[in-house]
C-alpha cells in the first residue's frame, strides 16, 4: 500500500513506464523532484506539454520535428543524392551528433522481425523505394544494427531497391575506436577482419 498522495503516485506510475525506469527508479526520480529540486517540476511539465502538442513525425523521412516536413528534409544545405536509412529516431540523432553525414535520412521505425510479426509495410520500406526513385537518390546507406533482424532488414531493402539504379551501401562493422580485441565478441572480430582495408 502506497503512502504517497494519489497525484504523486500517478506520476510515479507514469514515469515507471519509461525505458530504463522501473517502479523504484521512478519513485526515486519523483522524490528527487519533490525534494530540493522542486523548481524543475513546472518547467518539466511545461516542456512535456509543449512536446505533446507540437511534436510530429516528418511525413517524408519519419524524423521527429515540429512541422509536417522536418528541418533536415527542407534544408537546402543537405545532399539530396544520399539517403541514410536508420532503424529509429535515436539512431538519426546519433548520426547527426557525429556530424559527418550531410545527406538526408529515412527512419524505418524498427526492423523486420518474424518473431514479432513486423513486416515491410510496418517499417516504411515501400516509402523508401518511392523516395529513392522520386528524389533521384544515387546512394542508400544502410545504417542498421549488426543484429540478425538488422541484417535481415538490410538484405530485404537491398533486394527491394534492385532495378532502381541506386547504389546500396552499409556502414562498416568491426573494432570500435578505443576497443581492445580481448574484449570483443567473435562476431565483431569476424566482421572487422572481413571489412579490413589497406593501411
Swiss-Prot record:
Keywords: DNA damage, DNA recombination, DNA repair, Metal-binding, Zinc, Zinc-finger
Gene3D superfamilies assigned to the protein according to its UniProt record, in alphabetical order: 3.40.1360.10, RecR Domain 1
GO BP terms in the entry: DNA recombination; DNA repair
All residue ranges annotated as the Toprim domain in the record: 81-176
Signal sequence, start to end: none
Molecular functions per Gene Ontology: DNA binding; zinc ion binding
Zinc finger feature spans (C4-type): 58-73
Keyword Amino-acid biosynthesis: no
Listed Pfam families: RecR_C, RecR_HhH, Toprim_4
Listed HAMAP family: RecR
Similarity annotation: Belongs to the RecR family.
NCBIfam families, alphabetized: recR (TIGR00615)
Biological function: May play a role in DNA repair. It seems to be involved in an RecBC-independent recombinational process of DNA repair. It may act with RecF and RecO.
Name of the protein in its database record: Recombination protein RecR
Gene field: recR
Amino acid at each position: 500500500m502506497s503512502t504517497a498522495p494519489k497525484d504523486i503516485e500517478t506520476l510515479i506510475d507514469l514515469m515507471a513506464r519509461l525505458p530504463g525506469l522501473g517502479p523504484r527508479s521512478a519513485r526515486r526520480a519523483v522524490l528527487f523532484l519533490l525534494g530540493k529540486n522542486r523548481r524543475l517540476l513546472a518547467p518539466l511539465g511545461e516542456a512535456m506539454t509543449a512536446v505533446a502538442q507540437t511534436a510530429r513525425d516528418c511525413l517524408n523521412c519519419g524524423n521527429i520535428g515540429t512541422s509536417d516536413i522536418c528541418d533536415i528534409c527542407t534544408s537546402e544545405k543537405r545532399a539530396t543524392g544520399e539517403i541514410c536509412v536508420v532503424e529509429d529516431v535515436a539512431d538519426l540523432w546519433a548520426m547527426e551528433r557525429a556530424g559527418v553525414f550531410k545527406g538526408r535520412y529515412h527512419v524505418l521505425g524498427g526492423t523486420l522481425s518474424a518473431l514479432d510479426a513486423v513486416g515491410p509495410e510496418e517499417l516504411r520500406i515501400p516509402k523508401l523505394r518511392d523516395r529513392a526513385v522520386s528524389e533521384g537518390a544515387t546512394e542508400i546507406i544502410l545504417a542498421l544494427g549488426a543484429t540478425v533482424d538488422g541484417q535481415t532488414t538490410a538484405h530485404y531493402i537491398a533486394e527491394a531497391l534492385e532495378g532502381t539504379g541506386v547504389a546500396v551501401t552499409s556502414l562498416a562493422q568491426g573494432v570500435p575506436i578505443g576497443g581492445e580485441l580481448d574484449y570483443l565478441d567473435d562476431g565483431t572480430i569476424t566482421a572487422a577482419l572481413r571489412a579490413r582495408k589497406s593501411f
